[in-house]
Curated annotation (Swiss-Prot):
Disulfide bonds: 66-95, 98-168, 103-109
Gene name linked to the record: EXPB5
UniProt domain Expansin-like CBD: residue ranges: 185-269
Main subcellular localisation: secreted
Signal peptide: 1-24
The protein's name: Expansin-B5
A Gene Ontology biological process term: sexual reproduction
Membrane topology, from the record: Peripheral membrane protein
Residues carrying covalently attached carbohydrate according to the record: 28
Organism: Oryza sativa subsp. japonica
Record domain Expansin-like EG45: where: 63-173
């Protein structure tokens, strides 16, 4: 295992996910810039490097820089995650993006690709040795091995790998976790499980029944976005959320955060991007 600096965040107690009867829609047009990273359709593999961190059968770190916390060890992530070097993490804008990775240069490598999600940052050390570096969970790293050879592959520590960007397919709808520090004048949300691009270029919010139109949220850190009331008055729920993916696709979850919302709870929408 290759050690590296880790981000330390407060790990919150897991709270229930609430399903709400909300509606939404997706618009498949490009808003602003188009992502320069291919989604893997019709493009070949690129060369990079891989290491692993955390326990041999673990999920890397539950204090990761994207903010997903203990969710990384649960479905749909299922510990198949990686901390991305700077070109992959992109100051948090790469959180939630999906990649296939395979290794062939070690006798323990199966040559079969595994799919991982970027959930953390690897900002220095070995993660700067290649243009793209994945510091994978022990589970994901071992999954590249031939049957029964996971420990042997992990003992190599550092691998040359091939990777490509692929669409995310989370098999559930987008969810929004309200940050524990939110209050009537400040709302911060963690965006999870966006299909397709996986990453987000922008997040907008609309207060109760269209009041004030769409307002741009600011990226707080990782996959968390925030809005402060600048009127001196409390923000007015229910809140609709509009997501713009890295390639410009727009998805709207109407009234997804209800009146009476509570900090620390997760609210699941009824919408997601096409995978």
């Amino acid at each position: 295992m290759v050690s590296r600096g880790t981000f330390v965040f407060a790990v919150l107690v897991a709270l229930p996910i609430l399903s709400l009867p909300v509606s939404g829609y997706e618009q498949n047009y490009t808003a602003g810039r188009r992502s320069t990273m291919s989604l893997g359709r019709g493009y070949g593999w690129s060369s990079g490097g891989a290491t692993w961190y955390g326990g041999p059968q673990g999920d890397g770190s539950e204090g990761g820089a994207c903010g997903y916390q203990s969710a990384v060890g649960q479905r749909p992530f299922s510990s198949m995650i990686a901390a991305g070097g700077p070109s992959l993490f992109k100051n948090g804008k790469g959180c939630g993006s999906c990649y296939q990775i395979k290794c062939t240069g070690n006798r323990a490598c199966s040559g079969r690709p595994v799919t991982v999600v970027i959930t953390d940052s690897c900002p220095g050390g070995v993660c700067l040795n290649e243009a793209a570096h994945f510091d994978m969970s022990g589970t994901a790293f071992g999954a590249m091995a031939n049957r029964g050879m996971g420990d042997r592959l992990r003992s190599a520590g550092v691998l040359k790998i091939q990777y490509k960007r692929v669409p995310c397919r989370f098999a559930m709808n987008v969810a929004f976790k309200v940050d524990a520090g939110s209050n009537p004048y400040y709302l911060a949300i963690l965006v999870q499980y966006a299909n397709g691009d996986g990453d987000l270029a922008a997040v907008h919010i609309m207060e109760a029944r269209g009041g004030g139109g769409w307002k741009a949220m600011q990226q707080s850190w990782g996959a968390t976005w925030r809005l402060n009331s600048n009127t001196g008055k409390p923000l007015s729920p229910p809140f609709s959320i509009r997501l713009t993916s890295g390639s410009g696709k727009v998805l709207v979850a109407n009234n997804v955060i209800p009146s009476g919302w509570q900090a620390g709870l997760t609210y699941r929408s009824t919408v997601n991007y096409a995978a």
